[in-house]
Amino acid sequence: MESMHKAYKAIISSDWSECLAPCSPFDFISFNYPQLTTRLEAIFKQYTANHISLGEAARQIRKMLPDPITENQMDAYLDHSFSTYPGVPELIEWCLSKDILFMINTTGMAGYFQRICAKGLLPGIPLLSAHPMVRYPRQNSDPYHIYSLFEIKDKAKNTEAAIKTHQIPPNKIIIMGDSGGDGPHFEWGAKVNAFLIGSMTKPSLENYCLTRKIKINFKFGISRAQSQNKDLKKEMQVNFMDLSSCIQEVLL
């Protein structure tokens, strides 16, 4: 785990689900309670398209969940299903080696990332911004700081808090996302002149930015057109280490 006292030159604040990894934030629930899969998929699509709030999504999930997800249940899911897009762990490690603070900023659950860190499935993540609906007792393997994210707009608030804490200038910020749920984060990023990267860009993010005249500075991976469904085979051919040259040019 990276120290909170380390000096960083820059920051990347990135979404996780379908941005760095081919999963939804609720897959661990579907794994343990398969009967909820269809309803969970519908909720995910609704809030990433900005049709319902994240708070409303969390309320609906709490109501349908038979019991809280235990650490053992989360571990069983991770042992069976954890994956990222190719090159993501290496990219995180590369960023940290260049003194770039890598912050995962997601509507996913804090407990999911706590168990990922405990099992050593990713390099030490210094900062995490995630929903606390599933969160476990603190361990030494946890990110040194976990910001609570209750609504989509909290992504921007938590990134802003991180750059103030680490005294990172606006021209050293990259925001990365894939869907309309990242729209408010991109909107804030545009206001502070951050560099905006669409990763596996969905129409909902394209439309959000288009209607607000927000320029996505760089698109990486497979951009999905309005009529296209997810093509996991193509997505898994994208190597995220190829993004390092863009990051180096922008931040270093």
Across the structure, where does each feature detected by a protein language model lie?
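C-terminal cap/substrate-recognition subdomain and adjoining C-terminal extension
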Residues: 86-90, 97-101, 108-252
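Alpha-helical substrate-recognition element adjacent to the catalytic core
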Residues: 2-131
